[in-house]
Amino acid sequence: MNIILFGPPGAGKGTQAHRLVHDFGMVQLSTGDILRQAVKEGTEVGKIAGELMKAGKLIPDDLMIRILGERLDKPDTKNGVIFDGFPRTKPQVEALDKLLAERHSKLDCVIEIKVDENALVKRIVGRYVCAQCGAGYHDEFKRPHKEGVCDICGSTEFKRRPDDNEEAVRARLVEYHEKTAPILPVYEARGIVAYVDGMLPMGDVATKIAEILKEKGAKPISA
């Protein structure tokens, strides 16, 4: 089963994708990760991409599609994939359709994680991580058991992402609505979009997503 997790930055797409990888044996295909791996492996398209990246240039859609196609051809994608960061534009929607059709496959489901944006800003601005082990915390929702000490490794050093401030977060939301959100109606017209309340606890969101996928025929790997 091939799916897209859809929603604004900070909606929890990454967290839910990790759950699906674990529970359903799916592969998360992040365009950034795929690109870096292709460059590292030194494939033909990877070399071209590497030169563009060194020059500070954007990767064109046709090259990204070729890299994505190479990744889809690897055997670990047999249980399906979660597309992360792609597609983001209508031409990319068409390119993904073609890419899957060439492999006698298709996109089965788009799950939109719906969130209240003011609450989302609060969620993002308050998050921070342990500087040593990367364990995640939040000013309001998940503080360390002992103030100032990481629950996992005992470190007393923490850090925040530089762009996790309200101004930057709202700018990312504006960009999302202008550039990415317009592709959702394309999938809605096909009748393959399902909606999940992203303001529920993370475990409940995961349960809802799993129920949607099971209804569409996906089987957990433990089943």
Curated annotation (Swiss-Prot):
The keyword Nucleus does not apply. The keyword Transferase applies. Residues 126-163 are annotated as: LID. One of its GO terms (molecular function) is zinc ion binding. It is found in: Cytoplasm. PROSITE patterns: ADENYLATE_KINASE (PS00113). Pfam families: ADK, ADK_lid. AMP binds at residues 31, 36, 57-59, 85-88, 92, 160, 172. InterPro entries: Adenyl_kin_sub, Adenylat/UMP-CMP_kin, Adenylat_kinase_CS, Adenylate_kinase_lid-dom, ADK_active_lid_dom_sf, P-loop_NTPase. ATP binds at residues 10-15, 127, 200. Residues 30-59 are annotated as: NMP. Pathway: Purine metabolism; AMP biosynthesis via salvage pathway; AMP from ADP: step 1/1. Catalyzes the reversible transfer of the terminal phosphate group between ATP and AMP. Plays an important role in cellular energy homeostasis and in adenine nucleotide metabolism. PANTHER family: NUCLEOTIDE KINASE. This is Adenylate kinase.
